[in-house]
A protein has these predicted regions:
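Outer-membrane beta-barrel translocator domains and adjoining extracellular loop/strand segments
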Residues: 9-17, 74-82, 113-120
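Repeated loop/turn-to-beta-strand initiation elements of outer-membrane beta-barrel proteins
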Residues: 59-65, 93, 97-103, 139-144
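Transmembrane beta-barrel strands of outer-membrane/channel proteins
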Residues: 2-4, 65-69, 103-107, 135
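Outer-envelope beta-barrel architecture signal
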Residues: 47-49, 55, 59-61, 97-99, ...
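Outer-membrane beta-barrel "beta-signal"
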Residues: 123-144
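Extracellular/periplasmic loop regions
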Residues: 1-54, 116
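Residues on the lipid-exposed face of transmembrane beta-strands in outer-membrane beta-barrel proteins
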Residues: 51-55, 89-93, 131-135
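Residues that define the transmembrane beta-barrel architecture of outer-membrane proteins
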Residues: 45-49, 81-87, 125-129
Length: 144
């Protein structure tokens, strides 16, 4: 995925921000690039190179792993383009009809450029895990 960016040295603002975009779906589960993309007036855009694999272990269990390599879309003065890498893992289990249990784990390794344009400390370990129980009963049904 590619979101154009702005070098910040002109009179016009040229960065693209997908209003109401589904950032979580496309830019990693950790949501580093979700709402307010960057800090301190930076708007370098985003380039996400992603590779993933999905494996169906059985009729009821599937797993997915994705690797994201994030860079800025434009070269900023005195900064490298690399923002960091993220790995996302998710497992889904269809417990019964209309009930699914999902769990996931993600971690991110940022760079010095990430510190400047997003804030934070790239040397600290960034990770999170989650568990979700989804119940989707069919309440109303009609045949026409």
């Amino acid at each position: 995925d590619y979101l154009s960016g702005d070098k910040g040295n002109g009179d016009k603002f040229k960065a693209f921000d997908p209003l109401y975009g589904t950032h979580h779906k496309f830019y990693g589960s950790m949501d580093y690039f979700y709402a307010n993309l960057f800090v301190d007036g930076y708007a370098p855009g985003l380039m996400d190179s992603r590779i993933g694999v999905r494996f169906r272990a059985s009729d009821k269990v599937d797993m997915e792993m994705n690797y994201h390599y994030f860079t800025t879309a434009v070269k900023l003065p005195d900064l490298k383009r690399s923002l960091g890498s993220e790995v996302d893992y998710q497992i889904n289990w269809s417990v019964m009809k209309d009930v699914k249990l999902s769990a996931g784990y993600s971690f991110m390794r940022g760079t010095k450029t990430m510190d400047v344009v997003k804030g934070g400390n790239h040397r600290s370990w960034q990770d999170w895990g989650w568990v979700s129980l989804n119940i989707n009963p069919r309440v109303f049904f009609t045949k026409w």
